């Protein structure tokens, strides 16, 4: 439960960061983290 809450908060924070103008860098980093093969 707590882990899910933290994940949700992190997701929201990441969403705001992406919307803040750093989206390109954030998405590239996120892509590397989630898809190392790419």
Curated annotation (Swiss-Prot):
The keyword Membrane applies. One of its GO terms (cellular component) is membrane. It is a single-pass membrane protein. This is Putative uncharacterized protein YDR510C-A. Its main location: membrane. It comes from the Eukaryota. It is found in: Membrane. The chain crosses the membrane at residues 10-32. Keywords: Membrane, Transmembrane, Transmembrane helix.
């Amino acid at each position: 439960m707590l882990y899910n809450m933290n994940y949700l908060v992190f997701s929201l924070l990441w969403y705001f960061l992406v919307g803040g103008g750093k989206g390109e860098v954030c998405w590239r980093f996120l892509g590397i983290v989630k898809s190392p093969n790419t």
